[in-house]
Amino acid sequence: MSDREQSSGNTAFENPKALDSSEGEFISENNDQSRHSQESICKIYTAGKNNEYIYIGRQKFLRDDLFEAFGGTLNPGLAPAPVHKFANPAPLGLSGFALTTFVLSMFNARAQGITIPNVVVGCAMFYGGLVQLIAGIWEIALENTFGGTALCSFGGFWLSFGAIYIPWFGILDAYKDKESDLGNALGFYLLGWALFTFGLSVCTMKSTIMFFALFFLLAVTFLLLSIANFTGEVGVTRAGGVLGVIVAFIAWYNAYAGIATRQNSYIMVHPFALPSNDKVFF
């Protein structure tokens, strides 16, 4: 597996309804209702002696030049190779996210009775924040809109979270005599991130199981922590912390999937695609 996992053979098109093996045969019909100022992709077909060429609309690609949906690259769907040749930044961003999430979630789970979360500020500002933000910008340079949006956004989340616990920003001081207002404010803050993350998880429903699980369970974690701040229930906070630890390990799993290759590891990650949902969704 290379840093940017590529499709080979027919692995990207195992569903016979999605791709016919006969040369030049159209797979999907033109959509007469989709007419925009720019040409929309309305057909996919193969060509060549061994069906080595794939046409997406009027664009021609070698089959081996297309990337499959893969959590190790934060690529949620079939995509052509990027123009810019950089290393895969997704494992770096995922690692920063995973470590910071793990530390904060252990606090939320009340591991060892810890109640003061300030130790996470360093991770949040630098590894989970700055490093993840840089990785997201790198993803944008690689033409991965989803990866760039996800990593830059969560890098910003960790920077903003760290700022809450830095006295210079004066955020906690503003709520010194109004703890209920602070709980409600943090509840709305986390609720917004839950809604955003649910939106991202919808965009991973045609990818792999671990890729989808990362974003869906993260959204549930945000939702639990939001409810905990609204209600003040420690049990809900601990539930969010336990689920956050699981999310951290899933993020590390996806990061490892993007790093491990046949040249550097004996243990390879084989992604498992989500079941076909062509008949369930639009």
Swiss-Prot record:
The chain crosses the membrane at residues 87-107, 120-140, 151-171, 185-205, 208-228, 239-259. It comes from the Eukaryota. The keyword Membrane applies. Keywords: Acetylation, Ammonia transport, Cell membrane, Ion transport, Membrane, Phosphoprotein, Transmembrane, Transmembrane helix, Transport. InterPro entries: AceTr (IPR051633), Gpr1/Fun34/SatP-like (IPR000791), GPR1_FUN34_YAAH (IPR047622). Residues 108-119, 172-184, 229-238 are cytoplasmic. It is a multi-pass membrane protein. Residues 1-34 are annotated as: Disordered. This is Ammonia transport outward protein 2. It comes from Saccharomyces cerevisiae (strain ATCC 204508 / S288c). The gene is ATO2.
